[in-house]
Structure formats: structure tokens, C-alpha cells
A protein has these predicted regions:
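Hydrophobic/aromatic packing residues within the alpha-helices of TPR/SEL1-like helical repeat arrays
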Residues: 10, 44, 79-80, 114, ...
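Conserved structural position within tetratricopeptide repeats
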Residues: 14-15, 48-49, 84-85, 119, ...
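Short coil turns that delineate tetratricopeptide repeat
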Residues: 18, 52-53, 87-88, 122, ...
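TPR alpha-solenoid repeat register
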Residues: 22-23, 57-58, 93, 127, ...
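Canonical tetratricopeptide repeat
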Residues: 26, 61, 96, 134, ...
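Residue-level recognition of tetratricopeptide repeat
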Residues: 29, 64, 99, 137, ...
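Register position in tetratricopeptide repeats
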Residues: 33, 68, 103, 134-137, ...
Length: 283
């Protein structure tokens, strides 16, 4: 198959030029994607501390393997210890550790390192736009909405046609019942740019729901749940619109789906249990 063929050529290349370290990273990625974690760990031993760039790649990948094989807390502890050994980390390493903290929901730490990279990044580069987007998302997750909005709007000043930034900011405004009209306009623009993205489809459907355009909302939310049947938020949203359209048995079915999903958050599960019993309040 493609996996075995790819590895064959990588091994051949390594045999012919064992000093071409990049090939080892491709082999690691192959094993990682194929969930052969022990072989991935074995190949990672080729990356030595003397080579800062590739050794940091090894640390990141080992942290990911720890998360897969053991737990995320141990993974975060490992990468933090290794990061703290670096006396003068470059922007790439700072960016990576910020992303790791963000993905681990350690948003204050993520913000600290994103800020360091932002302070050195080119003012109008796409990289700076991405940094504002990531830091803005971190601020949003801890409820610092003014700072979040500033960062996300700054990202859009640099890259006004980034569908994902438009989507994130607009959805945040919807959740806060803030600037609904502008949020819908942003989502319509995001949808025109990425009409097949399930997250954007869900967001625009939810915007129409909040704007009480229920038939319009159902069309988008149905498509979102078809594209992401295992996403708890999408199932929750689709259940809500079905309830509004008086399709209550179906609504409870989709709400019930959420209870079976591992990544459904605790407060969402509590809310779903109430809705299954009582339906939507004031509806």
C-alpha cells in the first residue's frame, strides 16, 4: 500500500544518504499516522541534541507520542521540562510551545509565548495575522473578550479574506449576543470563501438560528451534521433547530447523540440532559 511504498523509498534514501536527517522525520510521520508508535520512537533516536532544529522536532513528537500512549498531562510536563532547558529559544520554538499550551488549554501560558513572537514578527506578514488569530483565540477562551476582539480584528486588517478568522470572530460575537448583524455579514463572507468547510457551515447556520431565520438555519445545520456527525456542538445545534421546527423526537435524538461523545464538555452534557427532559425553555 501507499504507507509501505513510501517507507521503502525513505529507507532507500536513508541508506544512500544517512546524513539527510529530514528523511527520518518523514519516516516518523509515516509511523505516527499509521499508529505504529514504537517504531516512530525508535526512529526519533536518530535526532541528537547537537542539532537544535531536529532535536526540538524530536521533543515535540515524543510529547505527542506520550499524549497518545499515556496522557496529556504527562505530555505537557515532558515538553515543558525540555523547553525550559533551552537557554535562548528561537521564534519557531516559542511558536510551537505556545501552540502546545493552547492545545492543552493552558491559555495564559500560550498568550505569554505568542506575545513574544508577535513582538518580533513583521507588521504586515501573514505570520503576524496567524499569531494574532491564535492569541486572540486564547484570550477568547479565558473570557478576555476585548483583547480577543482587538487581536482578531488586527488579524483581519492584515488578511481580510481569511475565512477562519472571520468565522472565529463572528461566532464569538454570536455566543455573546454582540453585533449579530455584523457577525452574520462576516459569516456570509467566510462562507463565500470556504463553502465546504463544516465549521463555517455550522456557524452560519447558528447565526441564522439566533436571527430566528429557522428554515434557512436548518438547511445549513443539517449539512454541518452530515459533514461532522461526531461533533457534539454540531449535533447540539441541529437538535435545537429541529426543536424550533417542532420536530421534537428528532431533536431529542440528536441531543442524545451528544451524550455518547467523548469530547462533549461537562457543562454541555448537563445542558443536554435538561433539554432532553424539558425541551428548549421559552420555545
Amino acid at each position: 500500500d501507499n504507507f509501505e511504498r513510501s517507507n521503502f523509498y525513505l529507507y532507500l534514501s536513508n541508506f544512500l544518504n544517512s546524513k539527510f536527517i529530514y528523511n527520518y522525520s518523514l519516516t516518523v510521520e509515516n509511523y505516527y499516522l499509521n499508529e505504529d508508535y514504537e517504531k516512530a520512537k525508535k526512529i526519533l533516536k536518530n535526532f541528537k541534541k547537537e542539532d537544535n532544529f531536529y532535536y526540538w522536532y524530536r521533543v515535540k513528537k515524543e510529547a505527542q507520542l506520550i499524549a497518545k500512549q499515556r496522557n496529556k498531562k504527562e505530555s505537557l510536563n515532558y515538553i515543558t521540562v525540555e523547553f525550559n532547558k533551552i537557554s535562548n529559544p528561537n521564534d519557531k520554538i516559542l511558536f510551537d510551545i505556545a501552540n502546545f499550551y493552547k492545545n492543552s488549554k493552558k491559555y495564559e501560558e500560550a498568550i505569554k509565548y505568542y506575545t513574544k513572537v508577535i513582538n518580533t514578527a513583521d507588521d504586515i506578514s501573514e505570520i503576524k495575522s496567524d499569531l494574532f488569530y491564535r492569541r486572540g483565540g486564547s484570550y477568547e477562551r479565558i473570557g478576555k473578550y476585548e483583547k480577543a476582539d482587538d487581536d482578531l480584528l488586527n488579524a483581519l486588517k492584515i488578511d481580510p479574506d481569511d475565512a477562519y478568522i472571520l468565522n472565529y470572530l463572528a461566532y464569538s460575537w454570536l455566543e455573546r449576543d454582540y453585533k449579530i448583524k455584523e457577525a452574520i455579514e462576516m459569516l456570509e463572507k467566510a462562507y463565500s470563501l470556504k463553502s465546504n468547510d463544516p465549521y463555517i457551515i455550522d456557524s452560519i447556520g447558528w447565526a441564522y438560528y439566533l436571527n430566528e431565520e429557522y428554515f434557512k438555519a436548518e438547511k445549513f445545520l443539517k449539512r454541518a451534521v452530515e459533514l461532522m456527525p461526531n461533533d457534539p456542538i454540531v449535533n447540539d445545534h441541529y437538535g435545537d433547530i429541529l426543536w424550533k421546527l417542532d420536530r421534537k423526537i428528532q431533536a431529542r435524538y440528536f441531543w442524545g447523540n451528544v451524550l455518547e461523545m467523548d469530547d462533549a464538555e461537562k457543562d454541555m452534557i448537563e445542558n443536554i440532559n435538561i433539554k432532553i427532559i424539558k425541551g428548549l425553555v421559552n420555545s
